[in-house]
Amino acid sequence: MHILQACKGMEHRSISSLIVNQKRQFLLTATATLVGSMIMNENNRLANKMEKGQLHYKDANAIFNKALEAQESKYFSRSKSNYPGHVPLFTFEKLLMIAGSSLGAYLHPERNEFIVALGESTAITPVLTKLQTQMLSDPVGRQILRERPRITSTSLDLDKLRELPDNTIGKTYVNWLDREGVSPDTRVPVKYIDDEELAYIYQRYRECHDFYHSITGLPIIIEGEIAVKILEFMNIGIPMSGLGALFAPLRLKPSQKERLYNIYYPWGFKSGLNSKPLINVYWENILEEDINEFRHKMGIEQPPDLRNLRKKYFEELKKKKKV
């Protein structure tokens, strides 16, 4: 009897302990869930504030950083872009670009990146402003600045130009492109000239370069490029053209220098000074005009065929070697 009562007492205590343990486990679980929920809610609240920019933590280095930024902006504050693709440069960067691109263009005139950088870095504001005034004082120049056409293979429709008569400006132009194996799409956009309209004027000059080749018949070999640079410099006044005409011949052979100095330099000076401003020619609107009438109207003489002169020179050289 006593044993039975003892067993019942032990069973009652076990059940009580089990109930207490279950209650304790439930309370712990509920407490953990409540605390976790509070933490998650606080994290979500902070995240929302952070996303909305409503959090303002005090930075111990804020005063120092602000002073440092002010000092840096005083000397190295790069201005904002004035047009798509514009890359503002500090004065010292422009000077470094002039030095580096000048050396690169002299040693490797075939590399376009040096020519492009030298052209833009030396296209100083007074020169471009003078061209701007020249365009604004001419009805066609004003139309170009107002409409801002771009010269590409699409805008010109080269296939249509190939169907024009042989004596037209358009057919002469596309024949020159085909013969030299070049395309108007290779002209890179201007990005280092700060003023937006002056940048377009330089872009226009750059894209018209092949027209100067085509109306004169000069090829893209080094002698032909120098001859066109002389014409450009005397007529338009772009500094890089003058630099190219001055220094590029230094690396040429005596026979090449002789042709330039005796034939193409005098031609470039005369045609460049006597002809009307080439920057004011709206090429896209005169593609069907007669090329000879255009040369006469502009005052541009067609120089001797450079390729024929070179061909004759090498033929004579071969004859002398045989003798």
Curated annotation (Swiss-Prot):
What InterPro entries is this protein classified in? Coq4 (IPR007715), Coq4_euk (IPR027540)
Comment field (misc): This protein may be expected to contain an N-terminal transit peptide but none has been predicted.
Q: Which EC numbers does the record give?
A: 4.1.1.130
Provide this UniProt record's keywords sorted from A to Z.
Lyase, Membrane, Metal-binding, Mitochondrion, Mitochondrion inner membrane, Ubiquinone biosynthesis, Zinc
Task: Name the cofactor(s).
Answer: Zn(2+)
Q: Give the classification, highest ranks.
A: Eukaryota, Fungi, Dikarya, Ascomycota, Saccharomycotina
Decide whether keyword Mitochondrion is in the record.
Answer: yes
Its annotated function is as follows: Lyase that catalyzes the C1-decarboxylation of 4-hydroxy-3-methoxy-5-(all-trans-polyprenyl)benzoic acid into 2-methoxy-6-(all-trans-polyprenyl)phenol during ubiquinone biosynthesis.
The enzyme class is lyase
Q: How does it sit in the membrane?
A: Peripheral membrane protein
Where is it chiefly localized? Answer: mitochondrion
Pfam families, alphabetized: Coq4
Q: Where does this polypeptide localize?
A: Mitochondrion inner membrane
Q: What is this protein called?
A: Ubiquinone biosynthesis protein COQ4, mitochondrial
Per the record, the domain of life is Eukaryota
